[in-house]
Amino acid sequence: MKKIIISFLCFIMFLACEVPEYDFNEFYDADPPALVFQPFLKKVVAGSVNRVDLEALEINGTAGMYIKMEYDPDFVAIKEVVAGEFFASTNQPMAIVEDQGTYIEIYIVYLSDGISQSATGSGVVVEVAFESLKAGKSQLNISDQSKVVDANNEGLVMNTFGYFIIDAR
């Protein structure tokens, strides 16, 4: 009888438990080809300067990008944007960054090494340094107005444009 009661109580406890649902919307959950942030969430100290990578995920034949990255200027100040290794060949990529107040525009172009005219694969496109101005949550978003082109200036289809959550305390 004791075994039956214990089994019954265990069964009731099993039914009463809820299975937690987690949001694992990270780099490898993106549907490639994609432009995503790595990591997608960062806890920071308010007033500090931090960095995040904007990465290409399985993009083939890329010769250039226009990236529109939106942010809230009440919470975030963009300090610096530096080209990553994705477009690097024997020549460093050409990157132009324009801050428009609520978004930045990043133009980055692959400079041919005489052998290939484009970059392929995954890697850091740019590293973004930002200052969290005050406590609270904010985001950096890659707008769907962003474009990726091949060597013939033909648009490449992107399946995912990522976001980055800043949790400043």
Regions found by a protein language model. Give the residues of each.
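Sec-dependent bacterial lipoprotein signal peptides
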Residues: 1-15
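Acidic, low-complexity intrinsically disordered segments
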Residues: 17-169
